[in-house]
A protein has these predicted regions:
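Alpha-helical multipass membrane-protein architecture
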Residues: 1-558
Length: 558
């Protein structure tokens, strides 16, 4: 099977096209609908990037001559709305769980639309500011983005490697369908081991193993150390030694993990952003200074002031909380991009909780308004995290970041509007009591936000984590993944760690086979990354397809 040359765009106009925008917009509408429903129904959200990359590629190829950059921009538009929906679904239903608002009046619906659009606008600003730092300066792996880029490159080029990629993709998709739709494969393998308070075992997910393989051993090793500290040390060790109860251990574990992640966020600002403030933020204050920004941003400070006014007057969040929210989005979008770039995971509702708690500590903000804060932050973090994957693809295929950013704006606005419409369609069909009901819409993440409205479970653990996160980051340790490992369930960290361990073994075998070849040639000769990209993509695609089927069946039953 012969390989073809990749077709690249020769200009901005060949990347940002009318047909690409139309295809991307239609895809964004569909993906946002499915993402909202599945986030509520299954308390999870499959990454759509590889699915939409393939849909964009096949759709544009059917319409005639295209190029890989036009495809990249189209799938950026498509995927942008998905995590906007996730940000809303992972926070807002908590309002109804705590019976804070009936949701039936127009004023509340407009408030939620303002929240979604505000999160998108802030996400766009911080994407434009931070894209170069994470994609080019830090060169984070962004495993989902790498897998999508491999899919586009090999899909466009064809040949033997494309056959390997799509073969792995088909296997992974079939595995996911048999596991999640037909329930013939167990979701977990525990080996009969049970540890009180610890979700021990291996998650039977080719995608998670592939994420571990793509990330590589360094980040995975630190991630797994975090899991050992949180689950084996604090939960199992602490309770076995009689130091605290299981409930207290869970509070210490989550507080410590969040503290480490927040501390790392401050470390990024102190060490990575502030020393380059003129370069990073120059476009916001100088007409002649573009800096690292994708587009000129002299309008951004004015927009932030307007948003603060809207938060105060329309959402009644108060002046101080409004300012904290905007500053909090700055911090948490940095954290979101860092975590996602290192692990492929984006706990957007956690970032919402962090800023929510900061507002509660500084002001007497009400519970309803606290949810508004969490939703704005979660939407912004969801959007920034998601499109950083798309920008990773763009960097690998040499797309114009400006074309992608305009695509992000279109997809994000569509996602904000559609997600609120779908949320209230479901609200009117099922009622407020359906949210939090395990048989209808469990919305587990929103339940977590609702439980955290009262405050941090263990403040000493949070402060220890905060200080540790700052210090370790300044010492150049990849400590963000440590905090994530402490916070997440053990099975997620362990499964990803096995993927990283497999990468070490494969690399050692390849070095033994190709002893006299340089490192770059050894990497090119191997197919491990191609197979991992296929495994990751197949399960992600199956997840989106199952989500679309669930939407059709679920909405058809209304």
């Amino acid at each position: 099977m012969a390989e073809k040359e990749i077709q690249y765009a020769k200009s901005f106009r060949e990347q940002f096209t009318l047909r690409g925008v139309l295809i991307g917009s239609l895809g964004s509408l569909i993906i946002t609908m499915s993402s909202m429903y599945v986030a509520l129904k299954a308390s999870s959200l499959p990454w759509p990037i590889i699915f939409v990359a393939l849909v964009s590629m096949f759709s544009l190829k059917l319409m005639g001559k295209t190029n890989i950059n036009e495809i990249n921009v189209a799938h950026t538009i498509m995927s942008a709305g998905a995590m906007v929906a996730g940000g809303i679904a992972f926070t807002v239903p908590g309002i109804w769980m705590l019976k804070l608002d009936t949701g039936g009046d127009l004023k509340f619906q407009i408030s939620l639309l303002v929240i979604a659009l505000s999160g998108v606008i802030l996400g766009l600003i911080f994407t434009a500011l931070f894209r170069k730092f994470f994609i080019e300066t830090q060169e984070l792996p962004f495993p989902m983005g790498q897998a999508a880029a491999e899919t586009l490159i090999l899909g466009d080029r064809g040949g033997k490697k494309a056959a390997i990629l799509f073969g792995a993709m088909g296997f992974s998709a079939l595995w996911a369908v048999v596991r999640d739709w037909f329930h013939k494969i167990p979701a977990f393998f525990t080996g009969g081991v049970t540890i009180p308070g610890v979700t021990f075992g291996i998650y039977m997910s080719p995608m998670l193993m592939a994420i571990g393989y793509i990330i590589g051993p360094l980040f995975l090793f630190v991630w797994f150390i975090g899991a050992l500290i949180g689950d084996i040390g604090i939960v199992w060790g602490g309770t076995t030694a009689g130091l605290w109860t299981l409930a207290a251990a869970a509070g210490i574990k989550s507080s410590l993990g969040i503290g480490v992640m927040v501390g790392t966020g401050f470390g990024i600002i102190v060490k990575g952003i502030l020393p380059k403030a003129k370069t990073v933020f120059g476009s916001m204050f100088s007409k002649s200074q573009r800096g690292d920004a994708i587009v000129p941003l002299r309008w951004a400070p004015i927009v932030m002031v307007v948003l603060a006014f809207v938060f105060t007057s329309v959402l009644h969040m108060g002046v101080v909380s409004s300012i904290i929210t905007i500053l909090g989005v700055w911090l948490t979008t940095l954290m979101s991009a860092q975590i996602l770039g290192q692990t492929g995971i984006n706990p957007m509702e956690v970032f919402g909780v962090i800023v929510l708690l900061a507002c509660k500590a500084a002001t007497a903000i009400g519970q309803l308004e606290a949810f508004f804060v969490a939703a704005i932050v979660a939407v912004a973090c969801g959007l920034v995290g998601d499109v950083m994957n798309d920008f990773k693809v763009g960097h690998m295929v040499r797309s114009d970041p400006k074309a992608q950013w305009f695509g992000e704006a279109i997809g994000g606005v569509i996602g904000a509007i559609v997600s609120i419409i779908v949320l209230f369609i479901l609200f009117n069909a099922y009622g407020a009591e359906a949210f939090g009901d395990p048989t209808v819409f469990p919305a587990a993440q929103a339940g977590v936000v609702a439980s955290m409205v009262e405050g941090i479970a263990n403040m000493p653990a949070f402060l220890i984590g905060l200080c540790a996160g700052i210090v370790f980051y300044l010492l150049k340790l990849p400590v963000m993944t440590l905090g994530l490992g402490i916070y997440l369930p053990f099975y997620l960290s362990f499964t990803a760690f096995l993927g990283g361990l497999l990468k070490v073994i494969v690399d050692l075998i390849q070095k033994g086979i190709h002893k006299n070849k340089p490192e770059t040639e050894i990497r090119k000769s191997g197919v491990g990354l191609i197979i991992a990209s296929g495994l990751l993509g197949g399960e992600a695609i199956a997840g989106v397809v199952i989500a679309l089927i669930m939407v059709c069946l679920g909405l058809g039953a209304i």
